[in-house]
Each structure stands twice: as C-alpha cells, then as structure tokens.
Amino acid sequence: MNYSFSRVIKPIHSFLSILSGIIFSVIILSSCGKGMNKLLKNPDPAYKLRMAEQFFVKKQYTKAQQVYEDIMPYYKASKEFEDIYYKYAYCAYNLGDYMNAENLFKSYLEIFPNSTKAEEVDYMRAYSFYKQSPKPELDQTNTMRAMGMMQTFINTHPGSPRNKEATDIIDVCRAKLESKDYKSAQLYYDLGQFRAAGVAFSA
C-alpha cells in the first residue's frame, strides 16, 4: 500500500516542480518585459544610450537592439550615431539575423564611407552572406554571392589582414559548390538517367 502511494506521490512532486519552474520563468519574463517597457518610455535618450551600451557589453543583444532602434532618431545628426549604427548592425549579426545584418552593414558603408571601421564592416557584410550559405543539397545562391563578395573585398582591400580568411572562405564555398554538383550527378546516375549523369559528371 505504501509502495503504491509513493508511486502516485512521486509524479505529483515532479509535476509540481516543473509547474513551479514554469511559473517562476513566466514571472521573470514578465518583470523583464515591464522593465524594458519602462526603459523605452523613458524620455532621456542619454540614459537609454547608457543602458543600450550595457546590454551590448553583456551580450544581451535583443535588449540592446530594441534600445538602439528607439534612440536612433535622437542621435541621427550626432557624433554618437556612427557607433550606435555599428553596434545595431552587430546586434542583428549576433542574434543570427544574417540577412538583416548584411543590409545594415551595407547601409553603414553607404552612410559612413570614410569610417575607420569601413574595412571591417565591408568584410562583415560579405561574411553575413557566407553565414547564410546552406548545406550543399540546397540552393547555393548565397554561397555564390559570398564568394563574389569575398573576392571583391580582397580586390578592394589588397593589404587587409582579413584576406587570408576571405581566401579560405572562397575555397570552402567552392568545395561546397563542387559537392552539390557531384551529388546532383550522382542522383541522375542513381535514377538511371545515365546520359544526364555523364553530362553532370563531366561539367
């Protein structure tokens, strides 16, 4: 009887522990959300900028991104705007939003063409395309774009210390395209389409 009772009690304890964890997480998330809303409603842009910088340093990129986006209109004509935009672009990159990051890096170069960070940002734009390169079985448009942009970077910045990595990435992308071509040819062969396979293998 005691054994049966313990078998019933243990799952209940386990369920209550999980439920407590969920409730605690909801409370924490709710309080964080309220804190962000309060910060975004704060009328002091300088305070918001300080908080955004703290979030960025702590790698809390979602929060930093929200605050940077909110204060951009206040700082658009100021000396701080370049650094804000730079970190805003990196927020997108660090959050894995590589498509948005590429667009932001591109915009940064258009807005600040003479920036001391222009070479770095130019590379990161190309690298963002590389990060969007999928496995060989899928469409390789971004792989080819990454190759082209890395080559353009090398041509534009002939003395850059990043050129070695750019060259390595081009080689990786080229190998991926070759792998895709081989797998496509192998698929034709496996399907018995030997003429198409022959053309693909010899391409």
Residue positions per predicted region:
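Sec-dependent bacterial lipoprotein signal peptides
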Residues: 1-32
